[in-house]
Design a protein with these regions (language model features):
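Mg2+/Mn2+-dependent nuclease catalytic core
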Residues: 41-63
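Active-site metal-binding core of divalent-cation-utilizing nuclease and nuclease-like domains
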Residues: 1-29
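Conserved catalytic cores of phosphodiester-cleaving nucleases, focusing on short active-site segments
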Residues: 21-25, 29-45
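Short, well-structured alpha-helical interface segments that form or flank functional binding sites
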Residues: 16-19, 30, 55-66
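Short His-Asn-centered micro-motif
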Residues: 35-38, 57, 78-80
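Domain-level recognition of nuclease-like catalytic cores that cleave nucleotide substrates
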Residues: 81-131
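Nucleic-acid nuclease catalytic cores
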Residues: 62-90
Length: 132
């Protein structure tokens, strides 16, 4: 992470809070999802429960859900092993939201198939691309 020195420095400030966003998935000018990407050497139910709990109750998850809500898109946790061979996804809408295990090709198809919500397209009057 090329920004690690900046992040380390910024996190030391005693001014409110800061959180980076791992990924915002877009289709053209419209956001379709906020993704929190996280890894673990192994993936089992205990790991899933721990990650889901952390992202529901702690600062980072609360703020990421806030960003997703402001954009009018869903918030997903994407948990994978270090080799990106095992992938599981949680559409986190409650502390008990479930996980869906996906092979790489299924994950790619799922992520590629996300489309803007009607409410996002209807309320978006800000152009997100340069007209140059």
């Amino acid at each position: 992470d090329k920004a690690a020195p900046y992040k380390s420095w910024r996190y030391q400030w005693n001014v409110s809070g800061v959180h980076d966003v791992d990924q915002i998935e877009w289709r053209g000018d419209y956001p379709v999802a906020v993704l929190e990407l996280t890894t673990n050497p192994t993936i089992d139910q205990k790991v899933k429960d721990r990650v889901a709990h952390r992202l529901w109750y702690e600062f980072s998850g609360k703020k990421l859900r806030h960003v997703a809500k402001a954009l009018g898109v869903p918030f997903y946790i994407v948990l994978m092993d270090f080799n990106v061979e095992e992938i599981t996804v949680c559409h986190q809408t409650s502390p008990e939201s479930g996980w869906v295990d996906m092979p790489r090709d299924v994950y790619r198809h799922w992520l590629s198939s996300l489309q803007p919500l009607r409410s996002t397209k209807d309320t978006s009057d800000t152009k997100t691309t340069n007209s140059q």
